[in-house]
């Protein structure tokens, strides 16, 4: 017999029903979120590891294909530091924030709005996601003012205003805006803006259904367990009792400021978990912590 063009299933292997269960579990979420806006802050290891970068692009593309409007705001601090080093520029941080002079802001623009942004766009487009790379300077998207400690940090800004019409124009056209967090003021001074802060401001301005932070943190930890859901009252109590400490405090405070601004839910997930984005959005258990204003009970996973 000539070589067969048919193909057998592997001996002893039967289709795994768990895959079907996962797909069915996702269906009500797909219906619920169709036409809604998700703002995703993309950072951490998920931006550095090649496998995780491709998985993120696939996940984002799938969200868009099922009718969710996706807006991405990305970081890129490591890339900025590497470029600065190559150019012989000194990198200085004060309380974890980059001191940004005129030379450094040029590096920020070149790196964030250049290679970092375009690499993300390319990966998403290779999966058919129709991404477009922009910065806060495009179409007057992000108006900024100097940060409170600008005398020390230099050209580090905070968001004053978001041009939602431009973002809506892109998402309504089926595109995925990938935004470099740079803004400028009325005197055309350009500012480096913290990506977390920019994502939160954009989510509030768009009245997004979700703001999702992708980082290297599993979620909000209480003892040796991760909170699946945390409500505002419990968060305040955990901070007061010293259960939530350190760098998690500003994350929690920012999350509830965002919810107070009209965003539906805020999520904190670990981008090192394979398909963390889809698991958080489309499964009952999720993988990280979701912040809500009120919940019937505290759920620990």
From Swiss-Prot:
Coiled-coil spans in chain: none
GO cellular component terms, A-Z: cytoplasm
Cytoplasm found in the keyword field: yes
UniProt keyword list: Amino-acid biosynthesis, Arginine biosynthesis, ATP-binding, Cytoplasm, Kinase, Nucleotide-binding, Transferase
Ranges that cross the membrane: none
Location of this chain's protein in the cell: Cytoplasm
Enzyme Commission number(s): 2.7.2.8
GO molecular-function term, one example from the UniProt record: ATP binding
Pathway recorded for this protein: Amino-acid biosynthesis; L-arginine biosynthesis; N(2)-acetyl-L-ornithine from L-glutamate: step 2/4
GO biological process per UniProt: arginine biosynthetic process via ornithine; L-arginine biosynthetic process
Entry superkingdom: Bacteria
Site positions (Transition state stabilizer): 41, 251
Major subcellular site: cytoplasm
Keyword S-adenosyl-L-methionine included in the entry's annotation: no
Annotated family: Belongs to the acetylglutamate kinase family. ArgB subfamily.
Listed HAMAP family: ArgB
Name of the protein described by the UniProt record: Acetylglutamate kinase
Source organism of the structure: Chlorobaculum parvum (strain DSM 263 / NCIMB 8327)
Gene behind this protein: argB
């Amino acid at each position: 017999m000539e070589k067969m063009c048919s193909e057998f299933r592997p001996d002893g292997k039967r289709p795994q029903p768990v895959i079907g269960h996962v797909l069915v579990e996702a269906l009500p979420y797909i219906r619920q979120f169709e036409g809604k806006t998700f703002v995703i802050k993309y950072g951490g290891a998920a931006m550095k590891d090649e496998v995780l970068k491709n998985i993120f692009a696939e996940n984002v593309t799938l969200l868009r294909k099922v009718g969710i409007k996706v807006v991405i705001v990305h970081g890129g601090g490591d890339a900025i530091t590497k470029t600065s080093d190559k150019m012989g520029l000194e990198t200085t941080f004060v309380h974890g924030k980059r001191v940004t002079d005129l030379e450094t802001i040029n590096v920020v623009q070149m790196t964030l709005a250049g290679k970092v942004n375009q690499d993300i766009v390319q990966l998403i487009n290779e999966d058919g996601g129709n991404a477009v790379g922009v910065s806060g300077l495009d179409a007057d998207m992000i108006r900024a003012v100097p940060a409170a400690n600008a005398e020390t940090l230099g050209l580090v800004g905070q968001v004053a205003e978001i041009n939602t019409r431009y973002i809506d124009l892109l998402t309504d056209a089926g595109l995925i805006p990938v935004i470099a967090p740079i803004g400028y003021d009325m005197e055309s001074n350009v500012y480096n803006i913290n990506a977390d802060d920019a994502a939160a401001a954009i989510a509030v301005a768009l009245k997004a259904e979700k703001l999702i932070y992708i980082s290297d943190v599993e979620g909000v930890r209480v003892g040796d367990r991760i909170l699946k859901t945390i409500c505002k009252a419990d968060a305040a109590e955990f901070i007061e009792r010293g259960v939530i400490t350190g760098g998690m405090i500003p994350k929690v405070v920012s999350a509830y400021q965002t919810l107070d601004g009209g965003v539906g839910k805020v999520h904190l997930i670990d981008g090192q978990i394979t398909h963390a984005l889809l698991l958080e959005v489309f499964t009952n258990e999720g993988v990280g912590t979701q912040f809500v204003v009120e919940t019937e009970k505290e759920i620990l996973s």
